[in-house]
Amino acid sequence: MLTLASKLKRDDGLKGSRASATASDSTRRVSVRDRLLVKEVAELEANLPCTCKVHFPDPNKLHCFQLTVTPDEGYYQGGKFQFETEVPDAYNMVPPKVKCLTRIWHPNITETGEICLSLLREHSIDGTGWAPTRTLKDVVWGLNSLFTDLLNFDDPLNIEAAEHHLRDKEDFRNKVEDYIKRYAR
């Protein structure tokens, strides 16, 4: 991360002296997305929920990172859930793409990793979807909340998990605990 931040600062310093050739300038250009991410990643790391950790496999690629959520309450307490986030070039006009890498029994996350979280929707009829004013911090806090206050059995993506909870809450809890033991340690 520091590498990209240092590069951006160096590039800003070079803007004043445009003596270099245009071909050389094009190699120094940094996308709007990457400029936003330098600021947003610093804000995210300063305001990360205590149940979350962020990892950047390549510190020069702030647009690809992994999030680990370790809930400290509720059905999913004791589990460790991995999410992969990719921020597209058109960010912040479009939301990041997020996938859950940990198999989970959850009404708002499918077993294949698709996630139902309104702020990850590019278009939303209720106004809760993605907007350019949202940031990575909002995404991380939203994903973290899927394990507590945003856990929603009334508007599920994994209908089978939601119906299971409606039918038999204790058996639902047992299946969640089984998934945690098998996939989320």
Curated annotation (Swiss-Prot):
Enzyme class, broadest EC rank: transferase
Enzyme Commission number(s) of this protein: 2.3.2.34
Family matches, as SUPFAM superfamilies: UBC-like (SSF54495)
Residue span(s) of domain UBC core: 32-185
Region Interaction with UBA3, residue ranges: 1-29
Pathway stated in the Swiss-Prot or TrEMBL entry: Protein modification; protein neddylation
Pfam families: UQ_con (PF00179)
GO terms under biological process: protein neddylation
Post-translational modification comment from the UniProt entry: The acetylation of Met-1 increases affinity for DCUN1D3 by about 2 orders of magnitude and is crucial for NEDD8 transfer to cullins.
Record-linked SMART domains: UBCc
GO cellular component, one term: cytosol
Active site: 116
Positions bearing N-acetylmethionine: 1
Keywords on record: Acetylation, ATP-binding, Nucleotide-binding, Transferase, Ubl conjugation pathway
Entry's Gene Ontology molecular function annotations: ATP binding; NEDD8 conjugating enzyme activity; NEDD8 ligase activity; NEDD8 transferase activity
Known catalytic reactions: [E1 NEDD8-activating enzyme]-S-[NEDD8 protein]-yl-L-cysteine + [E2 NEDD8-conjugating enzyme]-L-cysteine = [E1 NEDD8-activating enzyme]-L-cysteine + [E2 NEDD8-conjugating enzyme]-S-[NEDD8-protein]-yl-L-cysteine
Domain of life where this protein originates: Eukaryota
Functional summary from the UniProt entry: Accepts the ubiquitin-like protein NEDD8 from the UBA3-NAE1 E1 complex and catalyzes its covalent attachment to other proteins. Together with the E3 ubiquitin ligase RNF7/RBX2, specifically neddylates cullin-5 (CUL5). Does not neddylate CUL1, CUL2, CUL3, CUL4A or CUL4B. Mediates neddylation of the CUL9-RBX1 complex.
Assembly notes: Interacts with UBA3 and RBX2. Interacts (N-terminally acetylated form) with (via DCUN1 domain) DCUN1D1, DCUN1D2, DCUN1D3, DCUN1D4 and DCUN1D5.
Family statement drawn from the similarity comment of this UniProt entry: Belongs to the ubiquitin-conjugating enzyme family. UBE2F subfamily.
Name of the molecule in the record: NEDD8-conjugating enzyme UBE2F
